[in-house]
């Protein structure tokens, strides 16, 4: 195929969508001919096509074989995955026979379909919100097809591919593949290794190093493909130990010869086996108890064991550092550190995080925390939790709980509340029980230690959603802010002289975070709470300080735990850390653009803690005894793995003198390079080797060959890049013809390895790959003294895939949860509004003889209820109205959050100024802007109508408050708070006051509409047994005064037919005595 850069424009794209009958299935399958559209653009087109009922084309035959598999010779141990396309049919469909098969297939899922349709229907019918096609876009979750998982080469395939090609350049290309992609361990046998070595041409490139240090080379370039990495490594050792040692050529790498490498590798295997056995020790053997040799201190067997293992791992890492960059060894070390991290988490116990001054509630919360997240080491808490509750005699549990509220913050400790009432640490809420929930307001701080506030997620939620703090509680919040500041200063803040943390210090940090209630799971919960929180201009400064400090601590802890979960002192983690930081930065900044300053502090701290690198002294010991060429190869190899220059290394590039290169003109050399670029042969670049010493060769080769190839590569979509072989060809050409450009080679190799190994694209990977592509462009500019800009299609396709995944992972779940909650809330509020409107249409009459209320509409009697029940209903309506005023604020918060997400997406995308000229990206931005506009319109319409509901409800609530005030004027609380005389005076004034009202005229047919709401309202207020009183019946009721009985208490009821009772006591003493005693007899 001719590499013509003019043939890079996207071809016409056709869309195939399912017909109307297929929309009932959960998954919407779509096909696209010639994969040139970005994911987001494609989603939008697919949605519009479906909604406009575009005819369906016949399903096309999928492509079964990826060319990359044939080119690379992937290991046979990797299973090939094919995608089966469902067959769609349409009577009106037509399709040409010559259409190419689809290159990439997308499967779009509609998990939120029903929820969102209900929401749209609700908005359209109730609030007259126009239903928009574009807003459906957010509810399509694109499931990216994993194109190529992490794969390794098969040595047998490499050997077979070299049968017909024995030139040094072909062998160099083969070694380049091995060093770039690594060999699968199960394909490396001693016979194949020997056969490969025998094919290498002596005194060419780095072939002598491979022949002389074969054990090191293959250990350095082999990946452990088995899940049991230790077993895979042991089998690899058995094969490598059978390779005969070759004679020395005069200079020798003392630490990398076959015998030395085998000896160290065997020691590594034995050490790892021993350490893994120790890390498998049951926690029971590590239970804290006084050490036999030091009974007078707080030292325990448990902590002695932990320190012993840490020391052994540190010693292991130091002793075997010279092989700690061989891929097979690196994977073993990485696996060991993962095991250590998991083990350390599961030796944490309740006793480790208990403070001496913990309150009763503190201890209960910490028991629940430890048992929930680290159950294997805290089984003993099941009995301790029950005993703690049974033995408490000084704490009144009533003070901990809220029996009437239903705010969302209460739900964060719902299961914990059930555990307390059931005295069972394993209890789970299945919706079968009703019980009071742990308080989340600031009053709970009377029973909760300041340093333990993060164990109470509901309280954190409550504080974040307040605009002001009561004056009497400001001191409590100040203490919390001081505690947060101390945590930031002592645990988080980067010191001026930043040094990498030792393994012991990293584990200590895990311990300190857990002591204040933070681990991976709780950090995620707090990030979710923070992402749904939006401060307003009228928020009190003390709350803003709380929010900023909390965000700093939670996000730092979150990134720390992610890094710690992946940590090992290897190049694997070094490269992984870059990706982690970019991923988390993208998530944080897209949530809140104003977090950019905060992110700088977080990333600096993480970089300081996890500063893994290579030293020059290590390199000198690593290459001890080696010659210049050997050191050069090893330096390049380390650079390609780490991707960074930790220390300079100067070397000379030896080239063969060839007079041919100097006897041709620059114009002739230009034509030769152009001919090579246009050649159909993938190995055509090898013919340029004789000309590589020409003074103009580097510049001409880069301009005529490299730049067009890079332009072609960056003009592909990411899916096409994965099946295109030209990037690999370019790497081989540069490795052969530009050997001194190791930075350029590294970035190209990284881009290639990323393209074939990645199985998930997110915003972090986009940032990293964008950086790599522009570094390639920068090196080209330096080499050619020109200004070259790569094409944008590749980066845009990756960016839009990343945003698709972001929408799927973060936005869609949030929208699903929020719309479901808002929809339920609005439905409940509408029912409440209808009840209020129905009561406004009624007239109530009281019968003073029996204290019953008769509720009528016009002449129709609706409900008869007792006065006490009526007043209770009035109080309940007022309480519900006040709760709705608070809970309806969540709709405003969700509007601010969603519009903020969309705005941040646009801002983030627009910040990539180099890509803004791309048409697909512009369509994406326009789509998100339209969605944002529709969201604003929808929420505005909802807000207007909710305000109308509130205005209507306010009329009734004001009337009910007046009725309640009249009833409460002589209540016991009112008398206690003032005096009996003042209450009687106020009651007298109310009795003679004139309260006029207007009766609404109600149509006769309206009675049938209002009656069900009124009946349901008063039926729900019939007296029932109080579950709370039952649960709290064990507590003795104490009082410091004799309470006044409420005015409408049963004992204040008027005596009926009093004339019948006159002179009842004028009887013989014996008869009167009998009348009094008889009711008391059983």
UniProtKB/Swiss-Prot annotation:
Short name of any one Pfam family annotated for the protein: Herpes_U30
Q: Alphabetically list the UniProt keywords.
A: Host cytoplasm, Host Golgi apparatus, Host nucleus, Virion, Virion tegument
Which superkingdom, per the lineage?
A: Viruses
Q: Which InterPro entries match?
A: Herpes_U30 (IPR007611), HSV_ITP (IPR034738)
* Location of region: Interaction with large tegument protein: 604-1082
Q: Name one GO biological process term.
A: virion assembly
Q: Primary place of residence?
A: virion
Give GO cellular component annotations, separated by semicolons. Answer: host cell Golgi apparatus; host cell nucleus; viral tegument
Keyword Cell cycle part of the UniProt annotation: no
Location of this chain's protein in the cell: Virion tegument; Host cytoplasm; Host nucleus; Host Golgi apparatus, Host trans-Golgi network
Self-association state and partner proteins as the record states: Interacts (via C-terminus) with the large tegument protein/LTP (via N-terminus).
* Entry function: Plays an essential role in cytoplasmic secondary envelopment during viral egress. Interacts with the capsid via the large tegument protein/LTP and participates in its transport to the host trans-Golgi network (TGN) where secondary envelopment occurs. Modulates tegumentation and capsid accumulation at the viral assembly complex.
Instruction: Tell me its family.
Output: Belongs to the herpesviridae inner tegument protein family.
Q: Which HAMAP family match?
A: HSV_ITP (MF_04043)
Its protein name is: Inner tegument protein
**Source organism per UniProt:** Human herpesvirus 6A (strain Uganda-1102)
């Amino acid at each position: 195929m001719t590499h013509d850069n003019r043939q890079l424009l996207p071809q016409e794209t056709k869309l195939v969508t399912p017909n109307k009958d297929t929309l009932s299935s959960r998954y919407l399958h779509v096909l696209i001919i010639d994969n040139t559209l970005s994911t987001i653009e494609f989603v939008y087109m697919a949605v519009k096509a479906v909604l406009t009922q575009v005819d369906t084309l016949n399903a096309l035959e999928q492509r079964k074989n990826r060319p990359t598999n044939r080119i690379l010779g992937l290991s046979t141990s990797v299973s090939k995955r094919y995608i089966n396309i469902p067959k769609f049919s349409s009577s009106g469909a037509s399709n040409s026979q010559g259409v190419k098969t689809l290159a990439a297939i997308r499967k779009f899922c509609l998990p939120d379909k029903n929820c969102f349709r209900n929401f749209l229907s609700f908005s359209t019918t109730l609030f007259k919100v126009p239903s928009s096609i574009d807003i459906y876009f957010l509810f399509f979750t694109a499931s990216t097809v994993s194109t190529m998982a992490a794969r390794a080469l098969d040595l047998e395939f490499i050997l077979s591919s070299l049968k017909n090609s024995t030139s040094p350049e072909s062998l160099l290309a083969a070694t380049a593949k091995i060093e770039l992609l690594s060999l699968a361990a199960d394909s490396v046998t001693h016979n194949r290794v020997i056969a490969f070595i025998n094919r290498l041409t002596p005194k060419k490139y780095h072939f002598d190093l491979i022949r002389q240090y074969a054990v090191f080379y293959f250990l350095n370039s082999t990946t452990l493909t088995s899940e049991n990495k230790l077993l895979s490594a042991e089998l690899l050792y058995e094969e490598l130990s059978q390779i005969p040692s070759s004679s020395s050529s005069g200079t020798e790498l003392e630490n990398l010869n076959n015998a030395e490498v085998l000896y160290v590798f065997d020691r590594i295997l034995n050490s790892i086996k021993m350490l893994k056995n120790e890390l498998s020790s049951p926690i029971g053997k590590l239970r804290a108890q006084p050490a036999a040799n030091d009974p007078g201190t707080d030292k325990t067997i448990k902590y002695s064991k932990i320190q012993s293992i840490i020391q052994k791992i540190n010693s292991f890492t130091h002793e075997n550092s010279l092989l700690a960059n061989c891929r097979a060894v690196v994977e073993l070390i990485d696996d060991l550190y993962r095991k250590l991290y998991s083990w350390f988490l599961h030796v944490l116990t309740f006793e480790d995080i208990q403070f001496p001054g913990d309150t009763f509630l503190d201890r209960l919360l910490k028991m629940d925390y430890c048992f929930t997240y680290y159950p294997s080491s805290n089984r003993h808490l099941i009995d301790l939790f029950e005993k703690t509750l049974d033995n408490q005699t000084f704490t009144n549990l009533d003070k901990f709980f809220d029996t009437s509220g239903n705010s969302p913050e209460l739900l964060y400790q719902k299961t914990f509340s059930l555990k307390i009432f059931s005295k069972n640490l394993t209890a789970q809420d299945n919706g079968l029980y009703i019980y009071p929930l742990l308080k989340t307001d600031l009053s709970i701080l009377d029973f909760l230690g300041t340093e333990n506030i993060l164990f109470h997620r509901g309280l954190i939620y409550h504080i974040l959603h307040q605009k002001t703090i009561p004056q009497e509680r400001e001191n409590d919040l100040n203490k919390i802010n001081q505690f947060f500041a101390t945590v930031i200063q002592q645990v988080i803040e980067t010191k001026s002289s930043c040094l990498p943390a030792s393994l012991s210090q990293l584990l200590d940090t895990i311990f300190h975070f857990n002591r204040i209630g933070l681990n991976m799971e709780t950090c995620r919960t707090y990030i979710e709470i923070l992402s749904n929180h939006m401060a307003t201009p009228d928020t009190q400064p003390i709350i803003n300080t709380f929010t900023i400090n909390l965000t700093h601590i939670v996000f730092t802890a979150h990134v720390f735990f992610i890094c710690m979960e992946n940590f090992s002192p290897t190049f694997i983690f070094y490269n992984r850390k870059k990706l982690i930081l970019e991923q988390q930065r993208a998530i944080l900044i897209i949530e809140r653009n104003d977090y950019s300053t905060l992110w700088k502090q977080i990333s600096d701290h993480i970089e300081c803690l996890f500063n893994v690198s290579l030293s020059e002294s290590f390199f000198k010991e690593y290459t001890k005894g080696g010659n210049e060429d050997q050191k050069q190869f090893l330096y390049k190899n380390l650079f390609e793995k780490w991707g960074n220059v930790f220390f300079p290394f100067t070397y000379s590039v030896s080239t063969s003198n060839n007079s041919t290169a100097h006897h041709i003109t620059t114009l002739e050399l230009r034509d030769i390079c152009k001919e090579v670029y246009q050649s159909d042969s993938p190995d055509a670049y090898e013919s340029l080797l004789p000309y590589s010493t020409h003074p103009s060769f580097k510049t001409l080769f880069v301009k005529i060959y490299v730049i067009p190839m890079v332009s072609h590569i960056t003009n592909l979509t990411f899916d096409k890049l994965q099946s295109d072989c030209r990037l690999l060809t370019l790497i081989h050409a540069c490795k052969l013809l530009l050997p001194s450009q190791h930075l350029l080679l590294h970035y190209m190799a990284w881009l290639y390895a990323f393209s074939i190994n990645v199985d998930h694209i997110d915003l972090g990977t986009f940032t990293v790959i964008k950086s790599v592509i522009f570094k390639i462009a920068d090196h080209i500019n330096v080499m050619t003294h020109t200004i070259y800009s790569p094409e944008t299609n590749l980066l845009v396709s990756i960016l839009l895939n990343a945003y698709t995944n972001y929408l799927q992972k973060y936005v869609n779940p949030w929208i699903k949860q929020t719309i479901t909650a808002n929809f339920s809330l609005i439905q409940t509020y509408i029912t409440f509004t209808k009840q209020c409107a129905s009561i406004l249409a009624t007239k109530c009459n009281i019968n003073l003889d029996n204290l019953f209320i008769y509720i009528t509409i016009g002449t129709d009697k609706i409900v008869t209820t007792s006065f006490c029940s009526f007043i209770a209903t009035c109080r309940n309506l007022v309480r519900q109205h006040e709760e709705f005023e608070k809970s309806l604020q969540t709709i405003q918060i969700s509007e601010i959050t969603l519009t903020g997400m969309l705005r941040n997406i646009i801002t983030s995308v627009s910040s990539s100024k180099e890509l803004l000229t791309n048409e697909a990206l512009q369509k994406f931005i326009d789509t998100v802007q339209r969605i944002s506009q529709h969201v604003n319109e929808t929420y505005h319409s909802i807000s207007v109508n909710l305000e109308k509901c509130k205005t209507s409800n306010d009329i009734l609530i004001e009337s009910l408050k007046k009725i309640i005030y009249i009833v409460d004027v002589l209540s016991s609380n009112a008398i206690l708070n003032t005096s009996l005389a003042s209450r009687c005076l106020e009651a007298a004034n109310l009795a003679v006051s004139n309260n006029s009202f207007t009766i609404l005229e109600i149509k006769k047919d309206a009675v049938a509409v209002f009656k069900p709401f009124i009946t349901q309202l008063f039926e729900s207020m019939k007296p029932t047994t109080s579950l709370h009183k039952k649960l709290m019946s064990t507590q003795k009721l104490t009082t410091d005064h004799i309470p006044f009985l409420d005015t409408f208490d049963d004992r204040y009821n008027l005596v009926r037919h009093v004339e019948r009772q006159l002179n009842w006591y004028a009887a013989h003493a014996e008869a009167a005595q009998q009348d009094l005693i008889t009711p008391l007899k059983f």
